[in-house]
Amino acid sequence: MRILVLGIDGHLGWPLALRLAKRGHEVIGIDNLSTRRFSEEVGSDSAFPLPQPQERVSEAKKHLGVDITFYVGDITNYGFFKDIVQRYKPDAIVHFAEQRSAPYSMIDMDHAVYTVINNEVSTLRVIQAVLEVDPTIHILKMGTMGEYGTPAFDIPESIYVEAIVNGKKDKIIVPRKAGSVYHWTKVHDTDFLLHFQELYGLTVTDIMQGPVYGTRTEEIVEETLRTRFDFDEVWGTVVNRYCVEAILGLPLTVYGKGGQTRGFISLEDSIQALTLLLENPPKQGEYRVANQFAEIYSVKKIAEFVKKAGEELGLNVEIGSYENPRVEAEEHYYNPERKVLPSLGFYPKKRLPEDVKIMIKDLLPYKTRLERFKHVILPKTKWRKPQYVKRVR
């Protein structure tokens, strides 16, 4: 297949490109390199130094024998984007080209506005290009389990669900309750894709993925092939953050009660799942939802795994308790359905309790580099801004 990967420079985009190219697919990628800039904006960087785009392509050719085409540009620039879609006429478009950090979207109103404009315009441009070039192109969009929030019902793996409202039964979109501006943009992505899919019969896979952890995939065989690894309070996911904190001797930053529970998936298993979804597309005109996770844990339980792994490697690891900067349930029910990926042959290769030890081992050689960013790990970005809170007497 010919596959266009939007956001190829990112944590998932790069290893997915390597996997697809290694499997014989023609891979074209686009990235505006915004995550590199935004990470620097908050005083951070990737734990692993990242080569420049053309060097990444050269290293992939050198070590894996694959050819990847990498364009630096912004897909919200529609003339630029449509030209590439028209030139290559891909079988599938992987849409990772969005601002992906919940805390970044909550820094202030300007960051919220940027996140909404960038994420929604990019999705609408993908839809427009597919409609104008070839409506049969499979759109694979990265969503998030965070679209649903933490409902008291089992989260279905479908776009619609039957419900009774005021005594009347009807089919409704599965209820969403996002917890940040970023997560709301993912909800609106779903709304836009569903709207145009129902108008024009587009073929869509909407992936509801949980937090990703890990440093390795089968194709990351050299340091120069590594994908970016974020660990700060704005860009780093919880497992990544804990592993770096363990190395730097910082108490693990458990927010609030620590009962926040999510579905997690390793980097290797995420790439495996994405590849399966691309190589086994839905029927033409179908809107397919895939809940993409492998294990369900609370953030406090993950801290215990990291503490154990760190101590086995000779580190002194303490679990801290921090005021939660977010507005979220800290103890809740959580039970999402997962049938689509197993039906395609997905079987997780990694388990979080064991993989965190590998992560720490991979990060230890970069301890001196990580020390430079020690000041950006503790939580500072608060969801509720004091200047906007009205005092109720």
From Swiss-Prot:
Outcome following mutation: residue 186 to A: Loss of activity
Which is a Pfam family this sequence falls into?
Answer: Epimerase
Q: Name one GO molecular function term.
A: UDPsulfoquinovose synthase activity
| Source organism, top-level taxon | Archaea
Q: Which residues form the active site?
A: 144, 182 (proton acceptor), 186
Q: Which residues bind substrate?
A: 100, 144, 182, 209, 238-241, 253-255, 326-328
Q: What happens when the gene is disrupted?
A: Deletion of the gene results in a significant change in the size of the S-layer SlaA and the flagellin FlaB glycoproteins. Mutant has a significantly lower growth rate at elevated salt concentrations.
Under which EC number(s) is this enzyme classified?
3.13.1.1
Q: Which keywords annotate this record?
A: Hydrolase, NAD
**Which coenzyme or cofactor does it need?**
NAD(+)
Gene3D superfamilies documented for this protein: NAD(P)-binding Rossmann-like Domain (3.40.50.720), UDP-galactose 4-epimerase, domain 1 (3.90.25.10)
Q: Which residues bind NAD(+)?
A: 31-35, 74-75, 100, 118, 182, 186, 212
Q: Which reaction does it catalyse?
A: sulfite + UDP-alpha-D-glucose + H(+) = UDP-alpha-D-6-sulfoquinovose + H2O
User: What is the documented function of this protein?
Assistant: Catalyzes the biosynthesis of UDP-sulfoquinovose by the transfer of sulfite to UDP-glucose. Important for the assembly of the S-layer N-glycans. The reaction probably occurs through an NAD(+)-dependent oxidation/dehydration/enolization/sulfite addition process. In vitro, in the absence of sulfite, UDP-D-glucose is converted via UDP-4-keto-D-glucose to UDP-D-glucose-5,6-ene.
The family line of this record is:
Belongs to the NAD(P)-dependent epimerase/dehydratase family.
PANTHER family from the entry?
A: DTDP-D-GLUCOSE 4,6-DEHYDRATASE-RELATED
Protein's recorded name: UDP-sulfoquinovose synthase
**Which species is listed as the source?**
Sulfolobus acidocaldarius (strain ATCC 33909 / DSM 639 / JCM 8929 / NBRC 15157 / NCIMB 11770)
